[in-house]
């Protein structure tokens, strides 16, 4: 046997090793149980891969990002095998890894029942213990069609070879190169137990799956299109250790308690009535108070920063979106047109920027007016697929705190710097403090404008982001078609990351709208345009804050800031007078004068997460005092009325959490 030379890469260390022809990646890392795959000259491979002369081989640990994807993808295969063993009529869809887990789609006669999921999980445990080997096999298109003749969805995927998309998970099954099938082989006999069309790579055996759990099932359209059949999707999660699985399940339990949809109902804040439609929320009085306070504070801060408020309609002629390019690039995300005025197409607006451009262009502009900062709480409508609509965080109708800044190229860097600083400070005012930044750059397949303009815009944004001394993460190809952007990513109280504000530099739309201002030398000049949404949308930010605070909003945002609780009927009038005085100071204070016993009143207000309970008994009435009871159950007694009012006002004005 001849020798081959390979380079083994571990972090920054490189080791050259001479091995015999036919040596596998598994042999290179023999005895290292945490290594479950290899990256060979940049491509992920199974450990069964035979290394070739001159290749660079990197170990893939099960706890790495690649390793977790492989673990979860292999677990999805085990789940699909279990389903077909229990439900032989089930037809296979797609089963990719996703964030923190995996799913697989099945065409079955009836939806899965919770008891079915228990049976499937038990069968998966049996398969895991069998230690079946994952074995890769290259097949021709014709052979694949013959082998998978009873799997109609797999046959469709074979036809996508070379054009499969990551959007629907199809690219985990077929790529641009050779077709492969993964066989699950009996550990002792090598006999075929199950197989699936798949690109891989996979774990060496099913025994390499340390910990998993099935989470739920849901309906899902085949490949995400509502024109396709409805399938049944089972979601699961898999982790390198049982302790990590336990920690993840505890995290999910905490996240479920904080789910804004659950809290929205329990606290009577908002609802999404079926009669109105999916993704279209209505805010109840208490939710309306929170939203109004959020908007009022944002409006005041924007005025202080030199923004000018504008208002635009909800619908427009389609010609406007032809000019902006949205009909070329964004039509799938828009509601269908309404034909009015003898066949003229009108659209609900998905974005505010084209209308703001018309405001800029309504009259001649001078360089002395720049930067011009136009701001609007603008409601937009986007046709999100039903499968991705999620409460207030992914809606079909929502209001953006949308600003468009027009400036000279010389002002561009300073304006971006001011904008990002303003954005971060305003988010901190609402109680978010843990950030990192993401820089989204050009998608080579989907952009307008010149390469030079994109390069200039991207480099300017990079420099502005780096000034903030926050972590900066690259998002290659993630920008919208009209310009690169900075996204502010915020971590909430339980460590989840939310994309919040976006700041997008745009050299394209001023060209499309022929926007001009008169420069100091009298020349007509194109302005630079900056898109900026701080909350993203009011609805989404409302949901993020609700989950961040687990419904216990800080007093300045709470719909009811304090509730008076009388020890007895004789104390109601005293509390009503206190509440009236508090309301005159701008506080939101109620009195619970119901016939319920005091302890029940306290429990009721605790469930409603009211920041302060104002308790009054005989001693308080005679001494001109009140007692504060806080959310954590602690109490402060005998506070003079004036001091109590002053404290409430101070806590609200300073936006302190209690």
Curated annotation (Swiss-Prot):
Cofactor mode of binding and number, as noted: Binds 1 zinc ion per subunit.
Q: Would I find Transmembrane among this entry's keywords?
A: no
Cofactor dependency: Zn(2+)
Instruction: Using the record's annotation, list all stretches that form the TGS domain.
Output: 1-61
Q: What class of enzyme is it?
A: ligase
Which parts of the sequence are annotated with region: Catalytic? 259-554
Superkingdom per UniProt: Bacteria
The biological process GO terms on file are: threonyl-tRNA aminoacylation
Q: Which GO terms describe its cellular component?
A: cytoplasm
Q: How does it assemble?
A: Homodimer.
Q: What name is this protein filed under?
A: Threonine--tRNA ligase
